[in-house]
Amino acid sequence: MSTSAIALALSSSKAIEQLDHVQTETPNLKQEMSESPSNSGVASKRKLQSTEWLDPELYGLRRSGRTRSNPGRYVDTDDQEDVFPSKHRKGTRNGSSFSRHRTIRDLDDEAESVTSEESESDDSSYGGTPKKRSRQKKSNTYVQDEIRFSSRNSKGVNYNEDAYFESFEEEEEEEMYEYATEVSEEPEDTRAIDVVLDHRLIEGHDGSTPSEDYEFLIKWVNFSHLHCTWEPYNNISMIRGSKKVDNHIKQVILLDREIREDPTTTREDIEAMDIEKERKRENYEEYKQVDRIVAKHLNSDGSVEYLVKWKQLLYDFCTWEASSIIEPIAATEIQAFQEREESALSPSRGTNYGNSRPKYRKLEQQPSYITGGELRDFQLTGVNWMAYLWHKNENGILADEMGLGKTVQTVAFLSYLAHSLRQHGPFLVVVPLSTVPAWQETLALWASDMNCISYLGNTTSRQVIRDYEFYVDGTQKIKFNLLLTTYEYVLKDRSVLSNIKWQYMAIDEAHRLKNSESSLYEALSQFKNSNRLLITGTPLQNNIRELAALVDFLMPGKFEIREEINLEAPDEEQEAYIRSLQEHLQPYILRRLKKDVEKSLPSKSERILRVELSDLQMYWYKNILTRNYRVLTQSISSGSQISLLNIVVELKKASNHPYLFDGVEESWMQKINSQGRRDEVLKGLIMNSGKMVLLDKLLSRLRRDGHRVLIFSQMVRMLDILGDYLSLRGYPHQRLDGTVPAAVRRTSIDHFNAPNSPDFVFLLSTRAGGLGINLMTADTVIIFDSDWNPQADLQAMARAHRIGQKNHVMVYRLLSKDTIEEDVLERARRKMILEYAIISLGVTDKQKNSKNDKFSAEELSAILKFGASNMFKAENNQKKLEDMNLDEILEHAEDHDTSNDVGGASMGGEEFLKQFEVTDYKADVSWDDIIPLTEREKFEEEDRLREEEEALKQEIELSSRRGNRPYPSSAVESPSYSGTSERKSKKQMLKDEVLLEKEIRLLYRAMIRYGSLEHRYNDIVKYADLTTQDAHVIKKIAADLVTASRKAVSAAEKDLSNDQSNNKSSRKALLITFKGVKNINAETLVQRLNDLDILYDAMPTSGYSNFQIPMHVRSVHGWSCQWGPREDSMLLSGICKHGFGAWLEIRDDPELKMKDKIFLEDTKQTDNSVPKDKENKEKKVPSAVHLVRRGEYLLSALREHHQNFGIKSSPAISTNGKTQPKKQTANRRQSGKPNVKSAQKIESATRTPSPAISESRKKPSSKDTKIETPSREQSRSQTASPVKSEKDDGNVSLNAEQKARCKELMYPVRKHMKRLRKDSSGLGRAELVKLLTECLTTIGKHIEKTVNDTPSEEKATVRKNLWMFACYFWPKEEVKYTSLISMYEKMK
C-alpha cells in the first residue's frame, strides 16, 4: 500500500468531517417544508441557510491576479450524488404560524438579489474554482491536504516573495465555512439524507458485504445532529440521497479495509487512522451540545420552542427545537438566555457622558465583577492606564510584548466601563480570524455577564445574527454589549456596522493598519465611536511610517511624524526630534516586556544551528548563481531590485530543500531507479536537504526526551514536505497555515493542547500561524527558515513562550551554512533597533538602521554575495551530512538568551545594543571573482545554443505570420559583436529587428499620444517601455507602421471615391493588423501624427505659455468653469508638452495654469453620459472625455487653418518642376503666429479631402541651403545613400550595405561602443564624463585612422558613415553625428 493511499484515507475522513460539519455553508437561502425523518413524532426543525461564497471584496485592498493553488482533490466521477449535504435544506417548526414562516422566507428575496458573482459562486462545490460555473450536478470532491505530490509539486512559480506569502495571508482570513452542494430540487414531503457520519458492524456479521453487514449513522436534511439515527442499508436505499451511502461504502469502508490488509501498512499508520476516526466521533458528539440559545417562541398551542446554536457550527445551522428536548440538556444555556434578556447591562440603560468624562479614580485592587481569575499587578496597571486615557477622552496603543495577556487586560477594561461607569456599549472588537477562539474563551471567562456575540460566518449566519441578536424585539435598541468580528466582515458589512454608534472600539493585531491607504484603514476610520484602542505586540515592524499610520488612526492630525529617520547620520535637529517624538508618544503607548513584569515566566533560549548543504542543494544553489551571472553583474548599475529579489527567493528555496523546485523529486527518484517504496521516499526527503538531516536527528531526540515541538516555515510547500516526512516517520502532528479553514484551526489547536494529546509536532506557517495562537503546551520551537521581518519570528516564538508556560522554552533556528540565510538573518535583526529607539528608548546617535523596509539593489547584491565564493569551493558535503553528529552541532551552536535581549532594551541597557553589533560582510569583490570562469563559460555556451534555437523558432514563426515572405532587406541588424560568423549575424539580426506584439502595440499608443519619433523619441520609447531596444529598430518598426497605415488610408479613400453612394458619416473605423497586432486604427494614427506635427511647428520657442491659438474656434457650452481662447491655447500647449491624453499632467502643470479648469476626479463618464443641460450640477466638466473631444476639435481646426493658410500663399514652381524650399520660420515661432510672407503652398487646391495630410509637406530648411530637403517620412524610411550635406547637422539612416561595412570597419573598437551603450546607465556626472571621454576618444582615433587608410574620393563618405554608425551606441538619447564629431574635436 503506497503512502499516498494512507494519506488519502486520513484526508478523506478529514474532508468529510470538515466539509460536512465544520465548514458548512449552504449556498442558497431557501426555506421549505418537509416531514420528520422518523416516525417518533419529533418536530421538524427550521434550518437557516446561506448565500455566500468567498467574496474578493472581503479582503479590502485588492485581489491579485495570482493563480491560487488548490489542495489536491479526490474525485469519483461515476457517482451522481455526493456524500455532502444537499444544497436545498427544508424545514419548519410544528405549530408555527404562517407569518413566522414568512419572516424567514423574506430572506429568500434577499438571496435572489445577491450579485451574480456571489450567486454563481454558490453553485460551486467546496474547494472548487469559483471562476468555473456549471448548472450540472457536481461530482463529489475531497480536500486532500495530505496527499503527496499534489500541492507541493504544483507548477506555479512566483518570484515575488511578498506576493507569495501574501496569498496565504489572504487565504488565512477567508470565509471557509462552505458546504458542497447538489443542485437538484427536492420534493417537499420526503425524507432526505444529509450526511453519512459513521458506520458500525451489525452484531453477528463479518463485514464482507458492507451493504448488508453495516449500519450507518445518518444526519437528516434540516435536522440537527441531535436527531441522527442508525439505519441499515435496506431502510435507506430508496430514500433521496442514498447515493451518499454508496459513496461512503466505497470511499471509507472499502478503502479502510484495503489499507489495513496491505502488508506494507505499519502499525503506526493504523494507529493514526484509528485516532483520526475517534477524533471525528468526538466532534460529532460536540455538535449535539447547545452552544447558545438565540431566541424563544411561544406557539399558539402554548408550547415553547428555542432557536438553538450548536457548538462548533455557525448560526446558519441554528434549528428550532421543542422545549421538551432542549430543557433537559441545556438548562444552563436557557438560564443564560433569560439573564441576557433581562440584563441590567443593556445598552439602552447605560449612561452617555459625551466629551465631559468623570474624574479618574485608580483601581487599587481587582474589582469583584472581573471574574475568571486574578489579574497580575502589571495587568491591573494596564487596565488603569486604559481607564486613565478614557477619562481624559484619549486613545492609546496597548503594545505589551506578546504573551503578557493583552486580551485579558482589554476584556477587564471593557468590563470596568460597563460596571463602574455604566458604559454598557455597544463595544466593537475587531480581531484576526485566527484569534477569534482565544477572544471567545477570554470573554466567556472574564466577562461572563456581558452579552457578547461573535459576528462571523456566511451571509445567512450574519443575517440571523442581525435578526435575532442585534436589536430588542420590535425596536431599534441595541441588544448586545460587545460585538466580536474580524477585519473581513468589517469590510463586508461596513454599511451595517458603520451606522451603529460604538462606545468603544478595540482592534487586535493592529499592525494590520500600518498601511494608511488600505480599505480596512479607511473603513474603520469612518466608524462612529467615542474612543479607540489599538492592541499590538509589534507597534513598529519595519519603519516609522507604519507607526505614523497607527498614531494618525488613533489621533488624526495630532502628531506629525516624519516618514524616515536616518539613524546612520544623526544631527542635532534629528536628535531633538526623536527625543520630542518619544516624549509625545510615551503617554499614549504602553509597552511592557516579559522579563521586567513577569518574573515567574520560564526563560527562553535560542540556538542557531548551522548545517551544510546537500550535494543536490549545492547543485541548485550554484546553478542559480551561474545562470543569472548577467543579471548579477548588471543589476547594480541598472538599479533593478526585482531581478535580484527573484534570485534571492530562489536561493532561499535551494537553502531549504531542493524539492521546492518542480520536477526535482521525480528526477531524483528516477536517478536511483526508485520503485516508490516508503523507505526510498523518506530517504529522499531527508538526505537531499541538510536541514532535514539535522531536523530528523533533532526530532528523534526531542521525542525520546518527551518534548513537544512547533515547527515554523515561511513556505507552504515546505510545510507540505515536512508533513510528508512526519507522516512517513509516524510522528502524530497537526498543521495550520493560510489554507486551513478557521474552524479546523480551532479543532487542531484544541486537539494539540488537550491533556494527554498524542500530537508531537505542530506545523505552522510563520505568517498565518504567528498571530494570537496559544500553544504553550509545547516547549520547543524550531524555525525552519527565518523570516525577513524579525518580528514575525518573535511572534512565532511567543506561541509557546507566554503566561502559563511552565517549562523552559528552547528555540532552534536552522540555518544553511555559507548561504544568503546567514546575511539575511543579521540584516533582519537590525530592524529591531528602530522599534526600541522610538518606542522604548528614544536613542539618538549610536544605533544604525535601514531607512526603509525595502532592500536596495546594492544591499541585495551584498546578500547574494555572502558565502557565494565558498559555494564553488565546497566538497564532500554529502559525506559530512551522512556523518553528522547532533551533539557536536549543538555544542557549537550560537546561543542567544532572547529574554535578556529585550529586557535590557526596556531598561535602556547598553548590553542590548551591543548584541546587535554585527560585522558587515565586505561586498567589494566582483561576481567574476566569485563565479569561476569555467562555470560561466559552460553556461554561456548553453545560453548561446539556446538563443540560436529560439532565434530559429522565431524566424519560422515570423515567416508563417508574414505569409512566408522573405525578411525585408532594409531590416538590417543592430550592431552586435557576439559573433563574427555569417550564420550567427543573421540570427542576431533577426532577433534584434523584431519587437513583440505587446511592444508594437505600446509603440502605437505612444505615437498616438506624442506624435512622430522625430519630435518626441525619448518620450515615446519611455512610454512604450522600449528603452532597452535599439533606436534604429524602433524607428524601422515605426516607419513600417506609418507606411502601412498610410497605404490603408489611401486605399480607403480610393474606395470611397469610387463608391459615390457610400455615406461618409456612416464610415467605420479603419482598423488594420500590423505584424500580428490587431485593431490598429490607421486613420487615427496618420491623422494624429500629422496634427501633432503641425502643432509642434506652431509652438513658439519662447515658451508654452506664450502660445496663442491663431484662429477663431467655436466656444464651449455647459462647462463648469470659464473656458475661452486662453484655455484652448493652454490645452494645445499641454498636448504639445505632455502628450495627447495626459490630462492629469496638463492640469497640474503650473506653467499652464489649468488647475481649476480640469475636473478629473469629479466625473468618470462615458461618451454617452455627457450632461447636455445644467441640471446635473454635482458633476463638473470638463472631464477626460470632454478634453479628448475638445483636443481633437482644436487639432482639426489648427489643421484646417494650416491648409487654408497654405492655399492663400502658393509657392512658386521652378522651371525644372521642383518646389522651391521653404524659408526659415523663426519669426513665426517667436511670435506664435504664422508669417504669411514666408509661407508657401504645399498642396493643390483641388486636393481630395482626406484625414491624412499630403506626404509631400516639407520641413523648413536653412535660408542658405540650396539642396532639396527630403520629406520627414522619406527620411524616416530611406534606404539609399544620404543626400544631405554635413552642414545639415542631421542623421539619415544607413542602409544595410553601409551598416555591414561600418560594422566591419569598427570591429576593433566594439568593446568601447558597447561600453557606451551598457555601462553608462546609473553613473554619476563625474563617472559619466570620464566614460564618455575615454570611449569617444578611442572611437574617434580609430575613425581617423580608418579614414586615412581610405582612398581620397571616399574619405568624406566613410568618415560620415562611421560617425553615424557610432551614434547608434550613444547612451539614452539620439545624437547627431556632427555633434559627436564636434565633441571629439574638443577632446583631442
Curated annotation (Swiss-Prot):
The keyword Transmembrane helix does not apply. SUPFAM superfamilies: Chromo domain-like, P-loop containing nucleoside triphosphate hydrolases. Residues 1163-1181, 1255-1275 have a biased composition (Basic and acidic residues). GO terms for biological process: nucleosome disassembly; nucleosome organization; transcription initiation-coupled chromatin remodeling. Residues 191-260, 288-349 form the Chromo domain. A motif (DEAH box) lies at residues 508-511. It is found in: Nucleus. Gene3D superfamilies: 2.40.50.40, 6.10.140.1440, Homeodomain-like (1.10.10.60), P-loop containing nucleotide triphosphate hydrolases (3.40.50.300), Tandem AAA-ATPase domain (3.40.50.10810). InterPro entries: Cdh1_DBD (IPR041150), CHD1-2/Hrp3_HTH (IPR056302), CHD1-like_C (IPR025260), Chromo-like_dom_sf (IPR016197), Chromo/chromo_shadow_dom (IPR000953), Chromo_domain (IPR023780), Chromodomain_CS (IPR023779), Helicase_ATP-bd (IPR014001). Its main location: nucleus. ATP binds at residues 400-407. GO terms for molecular function: ATP binding; ATP hydrolysis activity; ATP-dependent chromatin remodeler activity; chromatin binding; DNA binding; helicase activity; histone binding; nucleosome binding. It comes from the Eukaryota. Residues 387-557 form the Helicase ATP-binding domain. Residues 22-147, 956-985, 1163-1184, 1205-1299 are annotated as: Disordered. Keywords: ATP-binding, DNA-binding, Helicase, Hydrolase, Nucleotide-binding, Nucleus, Phosphoprotein, Repeat, Repressor, Transcription, Transcription regulation. Residues 107-123 have a biased composition (Acidic residues). Residues 694-852 form the Helicase C-terminal domain. It is an enzyme of class 3 (hydrolase). The modification Phosphoserine is found at residues 1250, 1285. Its EC number is 3.6.4.-. Residues 24-42, 971-980, 1211-1253 have a biased composition (Polar residues). Belongs to the SNF2/RAD54 helicase family. Involved in heterochromatin silencing. Required for transcriptional repression at the silence loci of mat3, where it has a direct role as a chromatin remodeling factor. This is Chromodomain helicase hrp3. It comes from Schizosaccharomyces pombe (strain 972 / ATCC 24843) (Fission yeast). The gene is hrp3.
